[in-house]
Amino acid sequence: MLNLAVRNTGKLVREKSKSENIRLGRLFTKKETARLMAAMLRLDTERTAYTVLDAGAGTGILSAAVIERICRECPSCKQIFITCYENNEDFLPMLKDNLERIRKKCRHDYNVRLYITVYEENYITESKNHYTVTFFDSVEDKYDLIICNPPTELYEKDSQEASEAGGVTQVKIGAPFLFAKMAARHMEDGADAVIMLPATAASASSLTGFRQEMKERVSLERIHLFIGKQKNAKRAVPLKKNIILSYTKGAAPEKIQISTSYDEGKPESTVALPPLDYNFVVDEADGSLTLPKSIEDTKIVSYISHFPETLSSLGLKISTGLVIDSRCEGLLFSEPIKGAVPLLRQSCINGGVTTFPMPVKRQYIAAVNPTLIQKNKNMVLIKRVPAKSDERFLNSSIYMAAQLPSYRYISTHNKINFIDTKDKLSEMSARLAWGLFALLNSTIYDRYLSIVSKSKQINSKEMKKLPLPPRNIIENMGMRLMAAKQTTVAACDQIVNPTLHIIEK
C-alpha cells in the first residue's frame, strides 16, 4: 500500500516538473519516514476497528503507511475509518485515487473494510464543522490514531487559522504548530498522534505557550531525531530542521523513548537510545525538551544527573556581567585613568586563563555607578556565547583576585557570566574556585551542558541546575589542579575523570 502511494506520487511529481516546472518532491513525506511515523503509533492487536485522521494528507502517503501497518499487525481489526483533510487541487485527484486503490487492497488481501472520508478543506479552520451528535451534546470528531506531516507556511497572528487554533501570541507562527494544537483536540482518550514538527518546537522561547498547551492536553511518549553532519567533532551533534513527536491522550509515561537516524529513518540506520525519565526530557515549567542524540549522550546525562550538589547548595551563584557597551558611553576607556577599574571582557578568557590587560579597546570603566562595579574577588568566568571558532560549547577561565591586587573593585562585561558567592561579604576559596573550574573545563561537563542546553549560548538558568559533586571532592580536585599549575582541558580531564570514575575511550 505504501509502495503504491509513493509510486503514484512520484509520477505526479515528474509530471508537474515537466509540464509546469514545479518541484513538488520536497512537499511529500519520504517512504521510510512515513513507515517510521506509522511505527511510532501504538496499536492494540485485539481491536476490531480504528478511526484514523491524516490532516494535510497530500497524496495519502502517511494514510497508506498507517493502514498498511494496521492490516498487517492487527488481525482482529476488520474496519478502518480514515479521514483526510486536503485542499490543494493538485493533490486531491491523486489522493482519492490512492485511497480507492488502498481500499480495494484492504478488502482483497486482508478482508478489512476501509471507509474513506476526504474533506477538501483547510483542516485548521474547517475541522470544527465536523462533529458527532450525542444524546447530551455535539462534539468535534475524535480519532484513535492521528498522523500528520503539516505544510510549512507561516500564518499571521490575526489570521483565521491562528484565531481558530487559539493561544497564538507571536507575530507569525508556523502551520505545523497550529496543526498540532488542533490534533490534540481531536484525540480520543487513549489515542495516539504522531506529528512532524520543526526542531524549534523543542526549545524556542517564542513557542513556550504552544508547548505548555500541548503538555496540558496530551503527554509526550516518543521522539525521533534526524541527526545532521558533525562538522566539529568536539561540539554537539547538530539536529536537522525537523523532529517527530509522538503524543498520547492520557497520563504521562515514566520514561520517554528517543530514537535517532542520519537519513530519512531507515530501520537499519535508526538507533534507539536508552529510555529517559519523562521529567528529565520534558521541563516542568515551560515544556521545553532535552534531547540526547546518542547512547553515549544518555550515559553522560544519567551519570552527571545523580550528583547531589548545585551552585546554590554550595553557597554560590551565577550572574551575568554588569556592563553593556551601548549603555555606558563616555564611561569606557582603553587606558587606565584615575578612578577607572578593569573591565573583564570575553576576550580575557583564553585557554582557561583570565588575561588582563588585553590589546583591545575600552577595557576600563569609570567607577561612577555602583551598579556597574563589583568587589574584586575569586571567580570563575564563562563565555556566554561560544564563538564558531571555539572547539567547546563551555569556555571558562579561573580568575583570582590577586591577579589585580591594586584594585578593590573590578567590572565584568555582559557577554560573560561569572560564578561568585551568594554572600557579598564572603569569597570563594582558591581551592573551591579551581575545583569548580576543573569541572567546567573538563570534557564530560562540556558534553553534558551541550546535551542539556536548550539554546546556543550558556544559559544561567541551566547553570543554576547543573549537578555537581560534593564540596570536598571539588576542593580536592582544585588543590591538585593548583599544584599542577595547568589550565588546559587535558590537565582538567586527568584530574576530573579518575576522581569521578569516568572511563575514557
Mark where each language-model region is:
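Short helix-terminating capping/connector loops at secondary-structure junctions
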Residues: 46-48, 73-79, 107-114, 138-141, ...
